[in-house]
Amino acid sequence: MMVCLPDWLFLLFIFSILLQSGTNFYGTFQSGSISRQLSSLSSSIDQLFLKVQQVVYTRYPSRDRVSDPRRRRGLSSIPEGSEEATEV
């Protein structure tokens, strides 16, 4: 079974193959500088994340330090024997 392919589609297919091979060759040729750029970008993103984290924690410093009586009531709500001694 023969499939008729238009000329423009065939040329587009050939052009995409050439573009992909050229991109792969350029990426292999420039891999050193690309990896350096990616590592510098990664480190700058890490620094930005740390700065944002510091800003968030300085704006809400009491969020972690708040002693919620409902949370701390777990085992500490049971008296240690002071009531038992007074029930005589």
Swiss-Prot record:
The keyword RNA-binding does not apply. The keyword Mitochondrion does not apply. Residues 63-88 are annotated as: Disordered. Transmembrane segments: none annotated. GO terms for biological process: transport of virus in host, cell to cell. Pfam families: Curto_V3 (PF07436). InterPro entries: MP_R3. Keywords: Transport, Viral movement protein. Probably involved in the viral transport within, and between cells. This is Movement protein. The lineage of its organism: Viruses, Monodnaviria, Shotokuvirae, Cressdnaviricota, Repensiviricetes.
